[in-house]
C-alpha cells in the first residue's frame, strides 16, 4: 500500500500525459495515439466494447478470459472538433479530446456509463524485479446507481457502490472482477492479478497495546496438512483519526493474512464483528460518521499486522490493479442483466449443461472413512425413503500415500471399482475431493517432479503449465476417473492462502496471475475428462473461480464458513453477488461447515438454524449439505428435523423439470438460475435493494428465513400483475410488503402471476420414474410462457441438437393455455404423455402435494389449446 500511495502523488502530472495527438481507424478498432501510449477502442460485439491503453510494456499475450472470437461487428467512426465517436448498432463510445475520458451511450443517445475525467492511469512499478504498472480507472457513479458482483465476499455488503474491495482468492472468498450496474451495463476489469475496487487510501496509524496478547486459545483448524490443533494469540490495536465533514465513509480492515476474527470498533461501537476459524484477510464496511475526532480499535491474531484505511463516499467507482501490463477493461450493455451476462458469456465461454443428477441432493460430510461407509450410508438413505443423488468423499482417503495424493488407500478402500459400482447400483453418483498440493514424496508425484511441474519452494503444482495440466489429469484419470468417479471436488483451488504472491509460474511472476489459478485447474479437469469420456458430462465443485471458468462445468460453494444466523444471512448476499458475475452454479455447506460439536444433534436452537438453512438450500442452484467433523445425515438430528428435510427434498425433486429447463436456459440463452431482484425488476427500486430475497428461475420468489423462532416473515412483492403463495395458493397484489406465513416446516416462496410450472412425481433420485404424467400448474393473472426442456440427462449429444422443447403459453385475455408442437428428439424421448392441468387457487395446486386437475390431456407432440 505504501508504494501505491507514493506513486499516486505523481498522478496530477501523469494525467497530462494522455493528451490527444491523432487517431487511426483499423479494420477491427479505433486506435488513438496519446502523448503517452495508445488507447485502443475495440468493438467485440454490437454491445461489448474493449478498452486497452498500453504504454512501453508489451501487453499480456495470454488470453485467459475472452477466448471466443466473434466476427467483427459493423461499426463506424465519426469526428467533431471535440470528440471521436465509435458507433455500433447498439452502443456509441465517445472520446473527449480535451480530457481523454470515454463515455458510453445507447442507440437512443442516453449515456449509461462514463469515465471520470483524468482518472485513467498507468503508473510505473515493479514486481519480482520485473517492470509493471499500477493500472487505475475511475467511473462516474450517480447516486441512484446500484452495483453488484465482484464475486463472493463474506462481509454482507450487497450494493457495492462505494464499498472497498480487495480482490484476492482465499477460502470463503472468490474474486471475480466483473461488475453489474442497475443502469444496465457490466464491466469486466480485465486484469489477472490483485485488484482493488474503490481503494481506500487514507491510512489510520494503529498502535499495538503493550499488553497485546489479550487472549490465547487452542482451536482446531483445517490446513493443507490436515486437521490440526493450534494455539492462537490475539492482539488489540488502537488508533484515532479526524474527519473534516460528516458523511458516509468506507473502511477496509486488511489483516494481511487469513484470520479468525474481524473486529473493528469505532467510537466504542463494533462496526464489524465476525468470527470463524477461517476469515478472509480483508473486510469492508460503510459507516456514517460526523466530523471531528474518532477512535478505533482492532482485534486480530497476534501474527497478523492490521492495516485500516478509509475514504469518503463519492460519485465515483474505481478499479486499481498494482501488477498490470496495460489498462484493459470491457463494457457490456443490454436491456437487462440477462443480455449483459449472455454477451459476456458469449465472449468468455458459454455454460455447459451439468448432468441431471447434479441438480438433485448432494450428501457430504467431513468425512466418510471407507468404501463400506459410503455404500452403507446410501443404503440407509434408500431405506428411509430420503431422496439423494450424490455422495461425496472428502479428503484423507489417500492415507498412506501422502497428503493430497489422488489415490485410494487400500486399507479402507480396498476395491474402488467395486464400492463405486455398488453406489451406482444404488442409483447414486460419486464425487471425490482433489487437491493440487500432492505430497512430493509419493509415487504419484514422481512425474510432476521429473518434469519440474511444482511451483518453486511451494507444495502447489504449477497448473499454468500445459504439461502440468496433462500430467495432473493423467493422475486423476488413472487413480480415480477410471475407477468410476462421477464428479470432482477440486478443493483449495485459490490456491489456499493466496499462495501465488512472489512465486514464479510458467507464465512469469505469480503476482500477474494471482487470481487465475482456479481457472486452469478447472480447465485441466474439464478438457481431460471430455477427451477421456465424451459421453459423461463434467461436473466440478470448486472453491474458487475466475472469469471464463463457467465454460468448464463448474460449481462453486462458499467455503469453510461458520454456523450462525448472521453467517446464513451473509451467504445469501454472497451468493447473489456471485451469480451476477456470470457464474450460475453455486452452493453453501448447508448448516455451516464449522458446527457446534457433538451437541448439534440434540440442540433445538441449532436444529432451527439447520432446518431454515436446508429449506433455503432447496432453492439454491446446487443443493448440498456438508459439515466439519459432523455426521450430516438428516436422521442424526431426530425425527422432526428428518421429516422436515424429507418434505423439502421432495419439493426439490418435484420441481426438477423446472430447474432442468432453467439450466437449459442458462446454457442456451445465457440466463441465470439464482437471480438477484435487479435482474427481473430493475425499474422497481425497492425490489433492487432487497438483499435477502431473489428469484429462483424467472417464476419463483424465494425469501429465506434468517432469524430464530420465526413463524412469519416480511417479503417485498415487486410490482407485477400479482403473486401466489406457493404453499397455500393465496394471491397477493404486487408492489407491497407482506408478512408471509413461515412456520417451521417452510420458508416463503411466491409464484409470479402468469407462471407455468411443470411438476414431476416425487422421486428417490433423478430418473427413478418415467415422466409420462406431469402436473402443469398455471398461475392466472397475467400472460406467461414456459419452455419445457428434456434430454438424455447426461452426455453432450444436446450440443448437436439431441433434445426436446415443449412450449407452453397462457393468454390471460382469452383464458387459454396453449401447448405448442414439440421441437426436436433424443433417444427414448416420450412420444406420448399425460398433462394434468392445474389452475392454481387457494388449497389446490399448492406445495408438494398433487393438485386436482382442471383437465387432463394426452399430449403427442401436436398443438393443444385448452380453454378455461
Where are these regions (language model features)?
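Bacterial Sec-dependent N-terminal signal peptides
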Residues: 1-21
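A low-complexity, Ser/Thr/Gly/Pro-enriched, surface-exposed linker/loop concept
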Residues: 18-23, 27, 42-85, 121-125
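Solvent-exposed beta-strand/loop surfaces of large extracellular or lumenal domains
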Residues: 20, 60-76, 263-283, 451-454, ...
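Short, well-ordered beta-strand segments enriched in hydrophobic/aromatic residues
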Residues: 32, 41, 51, 86-93, ...
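Conserved, mostly hydrophobic/aromatic
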Residues: 41, 90, 178, 381, ...
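Catalytic and substrate-binding clefts that recognize carbohydrates or anionic sugar/phosphate headgroups
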Residues: 79-353, 365-366, 371, 378-383, ...
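Aromatic- and carboxylate-enriched substrate-binding clefts and catalytic-loop regions
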Residues: 273-274, 283-285, 301-306, 387-645, ...
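Catalytic core of carbohydrate-active enzymes
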Residues: 527-528, 535-538, 545-556, 578-588, ...
Amino acid at each position: 500500500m505504501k508504494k501505491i500511495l507514493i506513486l499516486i502523488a505523481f498522478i496530477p502530472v501523469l494525467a497530462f500525459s494522455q493528451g490527444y495527438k491523432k487517431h487511426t481507424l483499423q479494420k477491427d478498432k479505433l486506435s488513438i495515439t496519446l502523448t503517452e501510449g495508445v488507447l485502443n477502442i475495440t468493438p467485440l460485439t454490437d454491445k461489448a466494447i474493449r478498452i486497452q491503453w498500453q504504454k512501453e510494456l508489451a501487453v499480456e499475450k495470454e488470453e485467459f478470459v475472452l477466448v471466443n472470437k466473434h466476427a467483427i461487428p459493423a461499426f463506424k467512426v465519426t469526428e467533431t472538433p471535440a470528440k471521436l465517436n465509435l458507433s455500433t448498432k447498439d452502443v456509441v463510445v465517445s472520446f473527449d479530446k480535451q480530457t481523454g475520458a470515454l463515455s458510453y451511450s445507447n442507440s437512443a443517445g442516453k449515456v449509461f456509463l462514463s469515465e471520470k475525467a483524468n482518472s485513467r492511469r498507468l503508473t510505473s512499478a515493479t514486481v519480482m524485479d520485473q517492470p509493471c504498472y499500477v493500472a487505475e480507472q475511475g467511473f462516474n457513479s450517480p447516486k441512484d446507481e446500484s452495483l453488484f458482483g465482484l464475486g463472493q465476499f463474506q462481509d454482507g455488503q450487497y450494493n457495492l457502490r462505494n464499498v472497498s474491495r480487495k480482490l484476492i482468492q482465499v477460502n470463503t472468498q472468490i474474486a471475480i472482477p466483473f461488475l453489474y450496474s442497475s443502469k444496465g451495463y457490466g464491466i469486466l476489469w480485465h486484469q489477472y492479478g490483485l485488484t482493488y475496487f474503490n481503494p481506500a487510501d487514507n491510512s489510520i496509524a494503529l498502535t499495538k497495546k503493550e499488553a497485546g496478547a489479550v487472549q490465547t486459545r487452542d482451536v482446531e483448524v483445517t490446513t493443507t496438512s490436515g486437521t490440526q490443533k493450534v494455539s492462537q494469540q490475539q492482539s488489540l490495536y488502537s488508533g484515532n483519526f479526524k474527519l473534516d465533514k460528516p458523511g458516509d465513509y468506507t473502511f477496509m480492515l486488511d489483516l494481511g493474512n487469513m484470520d479468525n476474527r474481524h473486529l473493528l470498533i469505532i467510537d466504542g461501537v463494533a462496526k464489524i464483528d465476525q468470527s470463524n476459524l477461517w476469515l478472509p484477510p480483508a473486510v469492508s464496511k460503510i459507516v456514517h460518521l460526523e466530523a471531528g475526532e474518532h477512535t478505533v480499535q482492532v482485534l486480530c491474531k497476534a501474527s497478523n499486522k492490521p492495516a485500516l484505511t478509509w475514504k469518503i463516499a463519492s460519485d465515483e467507482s474505481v478499479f486499481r490493479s498494482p501488477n498490470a501490463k496495460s489498462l484493459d477493461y470491457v463494457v457490456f450493455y443490454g436491456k437487462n442483466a440477462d443480455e449483459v451476462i449472455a454477451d459476456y458469456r458469449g465472449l468468455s465461454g458459454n455454460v455447459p449443461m451439468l448432468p441431471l443428477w447434479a441438480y438433485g441432493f448432494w450428501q457430504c460430510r467431513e468425512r466418510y472413512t471407507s468404501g463400506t461407509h459410503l455404500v452403507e450410508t446410501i443404503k440407509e438413505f434408500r431405506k428411509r425413503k430420503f431422496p439423494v443423488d450424490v455422495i461425496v468423499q472428502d479428503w484423507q482417503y489417500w492415507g498412506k500415500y501422502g497428503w493430497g495424493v489422488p489415490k485410494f488407500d487400500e486399507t479402507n478402500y480396498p476395491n474402488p471399482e467395486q464400492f463405486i459400482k455398488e453406489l451406482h447400483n444404488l442409483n447414486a453418483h460419486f464425487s471425490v475431493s482433489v487437491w493440487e498440493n500432492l505430497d512430493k514424496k509419493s509415487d504419484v508425484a514422481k512425474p510432476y517432479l521429473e518434469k519440474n511441474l511444482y511451483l518453486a519452494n511451494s507444495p502447489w503444482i504449477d497448473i499454468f503449465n500445459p504439461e502440468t495440466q496433462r500430467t495432473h489429469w493423467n493422475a486423476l484419470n488413472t487413480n480415480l476417473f477410471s475407477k468410476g468417479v462421477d464428479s470432482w471436488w477440486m478443493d483449495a483451488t485459490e490456491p489456499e492462502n493466496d499462495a501465488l504472491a512472489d512465486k514464479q509460474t510458467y507464465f512469469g511472476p505469480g503476482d500477474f496471475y494471482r487470481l487465475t489459478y482456479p481457472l486452469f485447474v478447472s480447465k485441466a479437469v474439464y478438457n481431460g475428462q471430455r477427451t477421456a469420456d465424451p459421453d459423461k458430462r463434467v461436473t466440478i465443485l470448486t472453491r474458487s473461480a475466475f472469469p471464463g471458468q463457467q465454460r468448464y462445468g463448474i460449481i462453486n460453494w462458499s467455503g469453510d464458513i461458520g454456523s450462525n444466523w448472521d453467517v446464513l444471512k451473509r451467504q445469501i448476499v454472497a451468493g447473489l453477488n456471485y451469480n451476477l458475475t456470470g457464474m450460475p452454479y453455486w452452493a453453501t455447506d448447508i448448516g455451516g461447515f464449522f458446527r457446534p460439536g457433538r451437541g448439534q444433534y440434540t440442540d433445538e436452537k441449532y436444529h432451527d438454524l439447520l432446518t431454515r438453512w436446508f429449506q433455503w438450500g432447496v432453492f439454491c442452484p446446487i443443493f448440498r449439505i456438508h459439515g466439519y467433523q459432523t455426521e450430516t445425515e438428516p436422521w442424526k438430528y431426530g425425527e422432526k428435523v428428518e421429516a422436515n428435510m424429507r418434505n423439502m427434498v421432495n419439493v426439490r425433486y418435484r420441481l426438477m423439470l423446472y430447474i432442468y429447463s432453467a439450466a437449459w436456459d442458462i446454457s442456451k440463452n445465457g440466463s441465470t438460475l439464482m437471480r438477484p431482484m435487479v435482474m427481473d425488476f430493475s425499474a422497481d427500486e425497492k425490489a433492487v435493494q432487497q438483499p435477502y430475497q431473489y428469484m429462483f428461475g424467472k417464476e419463483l420468489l424465494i425469501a429465506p428465513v434468517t432469524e430464530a423462532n420465526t413463524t412469519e416473515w416480511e417479503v417485498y412483492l415487486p410490482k407485477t400483475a400479482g403473486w401466489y403463495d406457493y404453499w397455500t395458493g393465496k394471491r397477493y397484489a404486487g408492489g407491497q410488503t407482506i408478512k408471509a406465513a413461515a412456520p417451521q416446516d417452510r420458508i416463503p416462496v411466491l409464484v409470479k402471476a402468469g407462471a407455468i410450472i411443470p411438476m414431476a412425481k416425487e422421486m428417490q433420485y433423478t430418473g427413478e420414474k418415467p415422466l409420462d404424467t406431469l402436473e402443469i400448474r398455471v398461475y392466472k393473472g397475467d400472460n406467461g410462457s414456459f419452455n419445457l426442456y428434456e434430454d438424455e440427462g447426461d452426455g453432450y449429444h444436446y450440443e448437436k441438437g439431441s433434445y426436446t422443447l415443449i412450449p407452453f403459453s397462457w393468454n390471460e385475455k382469452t383464458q387459454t393455455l396453449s401447448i405448442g408442437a414439440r421441437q426436436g428428439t433424443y433417444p427414448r424421448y416420450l412420444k406420448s404423455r399425460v398433462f394434468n392441468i392445474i389452475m392454481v387457487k387457494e388449497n389446490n395446486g399448492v406445495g408438494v402435494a398433487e393438485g386436482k386437475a382442471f383437465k387432463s390431456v394426452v399430449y403427442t407432440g401436436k398443438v393443444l389449446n385448452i380453454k378455461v
